């Protein structure tokens, strides 16, 4: 086959990454769409809660929301995440709308804060100038007074620990079979567009389910947009085969099955598949702390 290069038609990818939040080397990228699949009592809630806790301890997240009908039964699991009671949401048909409205409200507050900071800096500059007070526009002084600058000259304080666009993580737990899973609830749309809501503020999502692809499992569009998958012990060969067909990468079915068996051979253990790994060898893990190096990666 002969080829001929055409000058000036090379595609230039955008500089902006799909994952805009910096994370430590061994923590997955954000914003993520995480799916955790495993039987009831298998450890999904504990695993996801621990991952979110790690992000919080690194100062990466500002707020955690939870959609679940069983929070009070599982309070001990989620307590380290310091979830505000107003951010614990029942899995109703309006739950997604509630989440989006909360993210949009945070974005609006951030925008207002940015304006307030600019005006505060202008006020400080004005106060340090030699301009006589009587010569300042009265309407401007009234605006500064309404903002409290005349009574308190200290710099305005943002409501979260770090001044930045709010970083929010949503956990969806024990919600299969509820109104949240109704096609009209907007859940699928949220999972597809999660990085773009509230004018690009975005949100990370962890969705915990008992079945990956069965009738009561995860909708295919959500599976196809997953960035991080946690698979717990599963004795169904049909389910494992289905998962392999969708996410098996360059592994043979036998290699995938052996890797899955190794990753899940301890109580509450699970296999992770990162679809946006920072390095090729970071794609597969046993739990979060052990990388599983595939033959194709090891040989490179």
Where are these regions (language model features)?
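Conserved P-loop NTPase motor cores
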Residues: 20-24, 31-54, 69-73, 124-254
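A structural signal for isolated positions on well-ordered beta-strands in alpha/beta enzyme cores
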Residues: 65, 204-206, 271
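N-terminal pre-Walker A segment at the start of P-loop NTPase domains
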Residues: 1-23, 71
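Conserved GTP-binding G-domain of TRAFAC-class P-loop NTPases and closely related GTPase folds
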Residues: 216-300
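Phospho-regulatory, low-complexity terminal regions
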Residues: 1-11, 37-44, 113
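A generic secondary-structure signal marking the coil-to-beta-strand transition
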Residues: 32, 63, 168, 268-269
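Conserved P-loop
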Residues: 41-130
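Residue-level signal for beta-strand positions within conserved beta-sheet cores that form or flank
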Residues: 60, 201, 268
């Amino acid at each position: 086959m002969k080829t001929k290069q055409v000058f000036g038609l090379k595609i230039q990818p955008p500089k902006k990454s799909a994952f805009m939040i910096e994370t430590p080397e061994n923590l997955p990228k954000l914003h993520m769409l995480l799916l955790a699949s495993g039987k009831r009592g298998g450890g999904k809630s504990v695993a996801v809660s621990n991952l979110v806790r790690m992000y919080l301890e690194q100062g990466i997240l500002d707020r955690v929301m939870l959609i679940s009908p069983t929070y009070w039964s599982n309070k001990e699991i989620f307590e380290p995440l310091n979830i505000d009671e107003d951010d614990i949401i029942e899995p109703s048909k309006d739950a997604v709308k509630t989440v989006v409205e909360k993210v949009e409200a945070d974005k609006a507050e951030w925008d207002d804060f940015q304006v307030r900071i600019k005006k505060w800096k202008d006020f400080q500059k004005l106060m340090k100038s030699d301009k006589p007070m009587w010569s300042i526009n009265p309407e401007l002084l009234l605006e500064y007074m309404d903002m409290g600058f005349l009574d308190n000259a200290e710099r305005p304080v943002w409501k979260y620990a770090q001044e930045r666009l709010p970083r929010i993580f949503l956990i969806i737990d024990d919600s299969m079979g509820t109104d949240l899973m109704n096609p009209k609830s907007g859940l699928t749309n949220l999972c597809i567009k999660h990085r773009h809501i509230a004018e690009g503020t975005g949100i990370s999502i962890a969705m915990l389910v008992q079945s990956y692809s069965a009738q009561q499992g995860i909708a295919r569009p959500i599976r196809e947009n997953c960035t991080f998958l946690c698979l717990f012990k599963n004795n169904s060969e049909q389910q494992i085969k289905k998962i392999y067909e969708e996410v098996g990468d360059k592994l043979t079915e036998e290699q995938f099955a052996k890797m899955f068996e190794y990753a899940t051979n301890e109580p509450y253990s699970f296999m992770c598949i990162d679809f946006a790994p920072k390095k090729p060898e970071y794609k597969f893990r046993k739990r979060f702390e052990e990388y599983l190096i595939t033959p194709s990666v090891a040989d490179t």
